[in-house]
């Protein structure tokens, strides 16, 4: 075991907190009941759930996702931790959390930590406890792995600064795209003054922080609840574009609303899982492909159509009758073609500096999926299916 009998009470609280943490930033992780790095001889039932965060370059990292406390003084309508809801709660002190996590890391069970908390005694006091935990891990236990810290509503600017110095990533749960929608979820929170302000501070501070050579600046992320407040995709994507373009967020998570028993929203209908999928697709087009919210087609309710992904829909509306000459299109136009992403677009540009794209073999070398691009591109002035028939 990575804990002993003297730690049993702390560990029981730890297990409970970890099991309750699934609600927060749920889309960042995929869980495994028997992860391959689980080499301890302890029974699997004694080990808290370990989650696998996907790396941008492929592969995944085992992370622990947990809370300092599941007690909370906030009464957000959608949240399982809301004040007054009847369920078993638990709390750990910063040194208790740091000790248990460091032992899990030493045992090879985890390589990173995502730490959040319910709010008790205000945002400043709660943020202090998160920072204390991170400082113990970084200094006493010399932990140099991935650390994701939540920024609490009401935290002050110096706490944001210290969190950025300690963490690999920080996050603020906006939950809604604007104040009007937030009032339906958390009527006692201020969208601009309590939540967006934290992200603005974080972006400003990290531009001026001095990091060690090779150390990456901490990334910023947020989460929006989809389907609980009558918000439209138009609203969500306008806010998402602001967060990407002005505050340089790395990722926005769209959490599908699923009603929690014994909350004010328990009788609402769960959101269709296709809706957040379309939002993710549109979000990545804004972040990585140069799209803006005005490029998307919305239905009468202000939402993205569910039957087709937004990039294909844009191409159907704009490229089907005006296909793109692949030998002449600039980088930004290439990104608009279904099947071509940033990496492939750069390959095309590099290839064209020395050669001309003339054949199916050239397209295959560049990794261009013919089935996806054939309706939208020209090769030397001819549709690809016509050209291929001559080869």
Identify what each model region corresponds to:
Residues 263-336, 368, 372-391:
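Long, highly charged, low-complexity intrinsically disordered interaction regions
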